[in-house]
């Protein structure tokens, strides 16, 4: 799992049937202290939200087959999922 900050939302009218009705979020991975890096090593990514996260929140990401299993099964077109909202973080 990884920590990320929700930076926006994605609207897609044409998508795989397995994504219909699912909320898509734009997320950027953050450092261990929850801060966006000064010069990000990677750009924003799209993740499917499973917990009702909003813009600006610190979240937990799950990727690959684990992300698909958060939803209904292994045939979902999902590679990255928001699986938790972080309340506190101590380093």
Curated annotation (Swiss-Prot):
GO BP: propanediol catabolic process
InterPro entries, per the entry: EutN_CcmL (IPR004992), EutN_CcmL_sf (IPR036677)
Localization of this protein: Bacterial microcompartment
Family matches, as Pfam families: EutN_CcmL
Alphabetically ordered keywords of this record: Bacterial microcompartment
Predominant location category: other
Biotech and industrial use: Artificial BMCs can be made in E.coli by expressing pduA-pduB/B'-pduT-pduU-pduN-pduJ-pduK (in this order). Enzymes can be targeted to the BMC, and appear to be encapsulated within it.
Domain BMV: 1-87
Gene deletion effect: Forms BMCs with a variety of morphologies, including elongated, enlarged, and aggregated MCPs and some with rounded cross-sections. Grows in an interrupted manner on 1,2-PD and vitamin B12; grows for a while then stops, then restarts as if a toxic compound was accumulating and then decreases.
Up-regulation conditions: BMC production is induced by growth on 1,2-PD vitamin B12 medium.
Protein's pathway: Polyol metabolism; 1,2-propanediol degradation
GO cellular component: propanediol degradation polyhedral organelle
Family named by the database record: Belongs to the CcmL/EutN family.
Note: Bacterial microcompartments (BMC) 100-200 nm in cross section are formed during aerobic growth on minimal 1,2-PD-B12 or anaerobic growth on 1,2-PD-tetrathionate medium, but not during aerobic growth on glucose, anerobic growth on glucose or pyruvate-tetrathionate. BMCs can constitute up to 10% of total cell protein.
Task performed by this protein: Probably forms vertices in the shell of the bacterial microcompartment (BMC) dedicated to 1,2-propanediol (1,2-PD) degradation. Required for structural integrity of BMCs and to mitigate propionaldehyde toxicity. The 1,2-PD-specific bacterial microcompartment (BMC) concentrates low levels of 1,2-PD catabolic enzymes, concentrates volatile reaction intermediates thus enhancing pathway flux and keeps the level of toxic, mutagenic propionaldehyde low.
Subunit: Homopentamer. Interacts with shell protein PduA.
Name of the protein in its database record: Bacterial microcompartment shell vertex protein PduN
Organism for this UniProt entry: Salmonella typhimurium (strain LT2 / SGSC1412 / ATCC 700720)
Phylogenetic placement of the source organism: Bacteria, Pseudomonadati, Pseudomonadota, Gammaproteobacteria, Enterobacterales
Encoding gene, per UniProt annotation: pduN
